[in-house]
């Protein structure tokens, strides 16, 4: 699955100002969703949706937990894959190798590096019987006014021309004293014709 927002076929965005129960502004949240058409064969369409979600509390507030939902309840759709965003304490190893040959001489080299995540815990709610996936992000040390950007994605198959995806962001903002305010939700269903 592509995990970069480049060369996309379609995109959409939504955002909202977040208010407390007295109507005072306490931050913003929003996203841009990118669609990539992967394969069209007969009535089947395979596409990726990558969402760049931003949770931005104002100074005096912080994010203690954020979630991003991607999927659809429409018939004729199936989630094939979902991004595995690593969690606190988990590590990812990246490798690269190069080789070359010219006139019987061969050379090359390789390297690898490991990165261990220590900024947040990520819980994945991936029920394989449904066509939705939810990532829940809990910052290890949520700072006052710190914004968080998360980039989950899914690969879906649709057996129709109109390909649907719902994007939902949820986040209760928290005061610096640890008092959790309203659960704030931003949700919209989108489609592309493919």
Model-derived features: positions:
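Deployable pore-forming modules of oligomeric membrane-permeabilizing proteins
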Residues: 1-95, 124
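Surface-exposed charge patches in extracellular/virion surface proteins
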Residues: 2, 25, 40, 74, ...
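Hydrophobic residues positioned within well-ordered beta-strands of beta-sheet architectures
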Residues: 29, 34, 47-51, 150-154, ...
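Residues in intrinsically disordered, low-complexity segments of regulatory proteins
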Residues: 34, 46, 112, 134-136, ...
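Short, surface-exposed beta-strand/loop "edge" segments at domain boundaries and coil↔beta transitions
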Residues: 55-67, 74-78, 106, 142-148, ...
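Membrane-insertion modules used to breach or fuse lipid bilayers
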Residues: 83-131, 163, 167-193
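Amphipathic, membrane-active segments
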Residues: 124-168
């Amino acid at each position: 699955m592509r995990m970069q927002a480049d060369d996309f076929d379609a995109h959409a965005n939504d955002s909202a100002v977040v208010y407390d129960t007295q109507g005072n502004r306490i931050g913003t949240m929003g996203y841009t969703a990118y669609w990539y058409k992967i394969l069209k064969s007969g009535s089947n369409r395979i596409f990726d949706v990558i969402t760049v979600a931003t949770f931005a509390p104002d100074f005096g507030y912080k994010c203690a937990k954020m979630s991003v939902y991607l999927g659809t309840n429409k018939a004729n759709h199936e989630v094939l894959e979902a991004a595995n965003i690593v969690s606190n304490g988990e590590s990812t190893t990246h490798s690269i190798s190069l080789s070359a040959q010219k006139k019987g001489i061969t050379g090359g080299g390789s390297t690898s590096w490991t990165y261990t995540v220590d900024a947040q815990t990520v819980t994945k709610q991936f029920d394989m019987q449904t066509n939705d996936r939810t990532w829940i992000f809990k910052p290890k040390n949520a700072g006052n006014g710190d914004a968080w950007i998360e980039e989950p994605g899914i690969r879906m198959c649709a057996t129709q021309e109109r390909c649907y995806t719902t994007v939902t962001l949820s986040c209760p903002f928290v005061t610096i004293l640890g008092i959790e305010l309203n659960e704030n939700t931003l949700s919209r269903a989108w489609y592309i014709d493919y």
